[in-house]
């Protein structure tokens, strides 16, 4: 995805560059592209969705064209510890980002006669505009639930969708699959990590972010997993009110990433709790 000028108007262009004759997903790519266009068109009016301007299927690689806000960038860039341009994401910013993405998922799950599962929510699918508003994009792996069904098989089995342990083993996705991947996104906002799998110096190897967080909680090392960059502009988080907000946020993220789908909350509850947390923050 990159920015260009189209008739003197700045736009973002995303090419489906994996479409080649020898591509392992060549047979399913057309379906993915059409799905992306259709679903994005249905939700493009939402504040937290990257606005679709159009598409072109006549290029060597099909392209999606989006509205481009100056100074917008990927969420991973804003979270990166290498970010030294002063654009730090505060605790309030991160709550707002989480709330915005939760609202989009809730809309997908509840606004259509056939609920839509986003299917591939990762931190790389989120951009942040110049006002700090999160913009979700890439609905190519979204899938509607069949009438009367609560689950559906992921036809693109070669893609690992972060939907939770059960989905990974069976290729079955549900609305709770989105809840799981959203919980992982919450953990990344909380810790400041830009990859769901990180290198752990203590273990001397790579570790999944959920396991990393749980291990530190068990060892009573809460301070070591909180991204201190959230508070550089306000000082530390010793305020009991702020600490409670952090604990509530972390608790919700862990509930979303429960092993059993039945133990995860619905997106309506997740979005409601996040809105309440966001309103309780007194500073940005």
What is the meaning of each model-derived region?
Residues 214-262:
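C-terminal lobe substrate-recognition/regulatory segment of protein kinase catalytic domains
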């Amino acid at each position: 995805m990159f920015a260009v000028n189209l008739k003197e108007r700045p736009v973002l262009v995303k090419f489906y560059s994996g479409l080649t004759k020898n591509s392992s997903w060549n047979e399913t790519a057309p379906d993915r592209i059409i799905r992306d266009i259709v679903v994005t068109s249905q939700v493009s009016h939402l504040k937290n969705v990257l606005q679709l301007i159009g598409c072109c299927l006549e290029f060597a690689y099909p392209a999606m064209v989006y509205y481009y806000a100056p100074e917008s960038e990927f969420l991973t860039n804003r979270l990166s510890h290498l970010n030294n341009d002063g654009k730090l994401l505060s605790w309030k910013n991160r709550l707002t980002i989480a709330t915005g993405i939760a609202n989009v998922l809730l809309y997908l799950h509840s606004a259509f006669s056939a609920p839509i599962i986003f299917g591939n929510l990762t931190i790389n699918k989120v951009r942040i505009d110049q006002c700090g508003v999160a913009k979700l994009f890439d609905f190519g792996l979204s899938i509607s639930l069949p009438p009367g069904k609560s689950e559906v098989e992921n036809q693109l089995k070669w893609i690992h969708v972060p939907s939770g342990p059960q989905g990974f083993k069976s290729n079955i996705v549900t609305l709770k699959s989105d809840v799981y991947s959203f919980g992982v996104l919450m953990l990344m906002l909380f810790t400041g990590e830009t990859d769901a799998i990180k290198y752990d110096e203590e273990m001397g190897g790579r570790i999944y972010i959920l396991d990393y967080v749980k291990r530190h909680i068990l060892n009573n090392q809460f301070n070591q997993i909180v991204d201190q960059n959230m508070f550089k502009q306000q000082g530390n988080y010793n305020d009991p009110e702020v600490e409670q907000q952090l604990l509530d946020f972390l608790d919700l993220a862990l509930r979303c990433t429960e092993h059993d789908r039945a133990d995860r909350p619905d997106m309506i509850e997740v979005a409601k709790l996040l809105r309440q947390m966001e309103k309780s923050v007194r500073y940005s």
